Amino acid sequence: MSKAMISRENYLQQLIQFKDTDFIKVISGVRRSGKSVLLMQYRDYLQQQGIASENILYLNFESFEYQWVKDAQDFQQLIQEKMPSSQEKIYFLIDEIQFVEGWQKIVNALRVSFNTDIVITGSNANLLSGELATLLSGRYVEIKIYPLSFKEFLHAKNVDSQSRLVDKLYSEYEKYGGFPSVVMADEPLKETILSGIFDSIVLNDIAHRAGVKDTHILKSVILFLADNVGQLVNPSKISNTLTSERVPTSNHTISKYLDLLENAFLFYKAKQYDIRGKGYLKTNAKYFIVDNGLRRHAIGKKGANYANRLENIVFIELLRRGYSVDVGKLDSKEIDFIARKADEILYVQVAFEIPENTHETDNLLHIKDNYKKILITGKYYEQTEIDGIEVIYVVDWLLQ
């Protein structure tokens, strides 16, 4: 397999599962996480299934060829030019569709009026808000893609999970993250590639799309969040901190920028949930960055706090596994993560090492329900449980 084509088998199987259904498949995720490669792998799969090449239409709206397609009228013209005369099903693979204003109506018309199978990708969470949701009324399925998991990282390196190299490679993964192009690059180039990814997200996906002319405040917010991963924050706290550092701003501006950072999939928000009161606390939340490599690139040596990096890896992996994730509060005690999926609830504490005072497991023991509770550690221990709570080394957990 070429360096550019790291297999994303889990995501590919999700696409295949919905092939030839009425659902529009929406692949969403941060820039450079592998959405386009996944489209290419789906195209290869279709051809292997005997679908004729002329019945597969790939359109990339970031490419030079389609720069003229600005709105729904242009999009309709393009479809009329490209649509085969075949009576067979046409497979549309449409990359970075958010660059076309009003694309929703055209995609819905394709779904309704023609024999089609449609996959679209986008690097903005607003893709699935407002008009698309109304027009399609539940006729789409979202496939959320992230940078490589540690399992995928090892697979890309052709290293077995039982290899002695695993711990060494975890250190590389934890340092440089899981963006496919970074993973496959030689070490001297990794930093340069991360810099390019960071700039393209900040300048193209956030500042340019939202019309942010002065990026200084935006970058200051990013640096603050990256430096405070896993800390409870709110717009007022961020605004006051930046203002004290001679970056004058307002709560309103901070709130707007937080939304932009979430929409670009650069940061994910974990709301604080009161376990006893069974409700969300509105004041504070934690923010986690999509990739540890980007975090380290953004804040440099300040990012040496291993506990924060560990917590970030666990949070993103929980999202990758399909959980919705909150941070928990039980009276004065903090639960790092409450992860929910269908009827399942998982309580997670994260610690570099097992503290002598068993503080981390004590917090879990105070939760009086029967859902699973685990402690994920940054150091390896022979010990596998404390008072009935599973203790697992982060590398082993990532490889489950």
From Swiss-Prot:
Source taxon at top rank: Bacteria
Listed InterPro entries: AAA_14, DUF4143, P-loop_NTPase
Pfam family, one: AAA_14
Sequence similarity: To M.jannaschii MJ1544 and MJ1637.
Gene source species: Haemophilus influenzae (strain ATCC 51907 / DSM 11121 / KW20 / Rd)
Identification of the protein by name: Uncharacterized protein HI_1038
SUPFAM superfamilies in the record: P-loop containing nucleoside triphosphate hydrolases
